[in-house]
């Protein structure tokens, strides 16, 4: 199923998902440093593997995907399948509503 078929995202629910599943490795605040994963500020419209100052895997650089709702929705289902060789160890979010919620939060918090 695609992002277009997903339930409407709830940014508040997405914030809880981010804090419990993503914040250990990622930040969203403008100017915040990188952790184990890159800072996600400015994520939408950016090409994978291009955040300044973060050491990406060759897989992320070579995938050259533009991060938008559709690509993130597919990526977050199974990151290692979407970008084989990625350094991201997170196994993914299987529930469509969780992915939609997280994307709603990321859209609001990384702009």
Curated annotation (Swiss-Prot):
Keyword 4Fe-4S: no
GO molecular function annotations of the record: electron transfer activity; heme binding; metal ion binding
Pfam family, one: Cytochrom_C
Residues recorded as bearing N6,N6,N6-trimethyllysine in the entry: 80, 94
GO cellular component: mitochondrial intermembrane space
Post-translational modification, as annotated: Binds 1 heme c group covalently per subunit.
Residues modified to N-acetylalanine: 1
Cellular localisation: Mitochondrion intermembrane space
Membrane spanning residue stretches: none
Residues the record lists as binding heme c: 22, 25-26, 88
Keyword vocabulary terms for this entry: Acetylation, Electron transport, Heme, Iron, Metal-binding, Methylation, Mitochondrion, Respiratory chain, Transport
PANTHER family given in the database record: CYTOCHROME C
Family: Belongs to the cytochrome c family.
General function of this protein: Electron carrier protein. The oxidized form of the cytochrome c heme group can accept an electron from the heme group of the cytochrome c1 subunit of cytochrome reductase. Cytochrome c then transfers this electron to the cytochrome oxidase complex, the final protein carrier in the mitochondrial electron-transport chain.
Protein name listed in UniProt: Cytochrome c
């Amino acid at each position: 199923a695609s992002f277009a078929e997903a339930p409407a995202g709830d940014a508040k629910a997405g914030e809880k998902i981010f804090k419990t599943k993503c914040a250990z490795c990622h930040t969203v605040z403008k100017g915040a440093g990188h952790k184990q994963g890159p800072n996600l500020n400015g994520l939408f419209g950016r090409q994978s593997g291009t955040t300044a100052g973060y050491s990406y895997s060759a897989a992320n650089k070579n995938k050259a995907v533009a991060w938008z709702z559709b690509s993130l929705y597919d990526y977050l289902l199974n990151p290692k399948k979407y970008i084989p060789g990625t350094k991201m160890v997170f196994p993914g979010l299987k529930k469509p509503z969780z992915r939609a919620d997280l994307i709603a939060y990321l859209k609001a918090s990384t702009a």
